[in-house]
């Protein structure tokens, strides 16, 4: 099983390097890191400040303009550059809590045949305020579950909730369903 990670980026920085480093230590290896960068000049300016060899060897960078960027279309373009079985889309500021993130996501994806997507919990920052902590704990409970149409009466709109901060998709099902809606203006 091949796993690619697609990362939409605007204004790369040290947090992106930290993400690259953490993804390089996952127990499930990343085949390719596919960065969908907004504004080539920002990437070039940042890359010039790095030590030679600092960027991962499995990194591919594709550029879009600010006008072309869209939360759905940019992820679609990144997934189109992939030939992996699993595509993990994550934001550049989402840092794995441990080395088992990709294993947990892929285990969830392949635990049942008809599962198409699995998303990660967002943990509250240690120094966050009480409202942010409650929001994270409410939206991302510590128990995993499979959601189905039959859960609609119980979960309501939460039945369809999926975080775009860090989610893994079976590429074959994703493509069969047509990918993300274009002109996605929320994150």
Residue ranges with predicted function:
Residues 100-132:
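Conserved donor NDP-sugar-binding/catalytic core segment of glycosyltransferases
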Residues 23-63:
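Acidic donor-binding segment of Leloir-type glycosyltransferases
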Residues 65-82:
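Glycine-rich, basic loop-to-helix element that forms the pyrophosphate-binding segment
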Residues 150-169, 184-187:
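A recurrent flexible, glycine/aromatic-enriched loop bordering the glycosyltransferase active site
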Residues 2-4:
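Cell-envelope/extracellular polymer assembly enzymes that use nucleotide-activated donors
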Residues 12-25:
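Short, well-formed alpha-helical segments that are part of the catalytic scaffolds
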Residues 83-84, 163-177:
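Conserved nucleotide-sugar donor-binding
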Residues 87:
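Short aromatic/hydrophobic "clamp" motif used to bind/position activated sugar donors
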